[in-house]
């Protein structure tokens, strides 16, 4: 029986490249001249710390970061930014988390979406991924299109396709 896995992974090398590109753009932008602003990638915690002198500039830095991530093939929804920024002294900062893996609540949403579609496939939650099996390859391709168009708030990759 053909099957594939639905996963949510972010390539940390691409994230590192995007952060370096954003830092390079930050150094050349006129509106950030003589301003203390930075991007810091923590690969261990999978977070990106954005720091600047005002909350408005932090929002601008987040826009730069999202644009650079998108250019590197990482969707903007793969980072989770808190609503409130931290303020200490004369700097504002925010720590954006990278979404890795599919948590159980999201996996249940995916399985429910697939079951509600009445496609002839079975979906199973296996840790941080969802395995989808079916008799026909066309059903699996329809399932991929369904999950991509599902607007679930997280980017998904489809791998381990077996016939």
UniProtKB/Swiss-Prot annotation:
Pfam families tied to this protein: DUF520
Domain of life: Bacteria
One term under GO cellular component: cytosol
SUPFAM superfamilies in the cross-refs: YajQ-like (SSF89963)
Annotated Gene3D superfamilies: 3.30.70.860, YajQ-like, domain 2
Keyword Iron: no
Keywords: Nucleotide-binding
Keyword match Nucleotide-binding: yes
GO MF annotation: an example: nucleotide binding
Record-linked InterPro entries: DUF520, UPF0234-like_C, UPF0234_N, YajQ-like_sf
Purpose of the protein: Nucleotide-binding protein.
PANTHER family: UPF0234 PROTEIN YAJQ
Protein family membership: Belongs to the YajQ family.
Protein name in UniProt: Nucleotide-binding protein ESA_02876
Annotated organism of origin: Cronobacter sakazakii (strain ATCC BAA-894)
Organism placement in taxonomy: Bacteria, Pseudomonadati, Pseudomonadota, Gammaproteobacteria, Enterobacterales
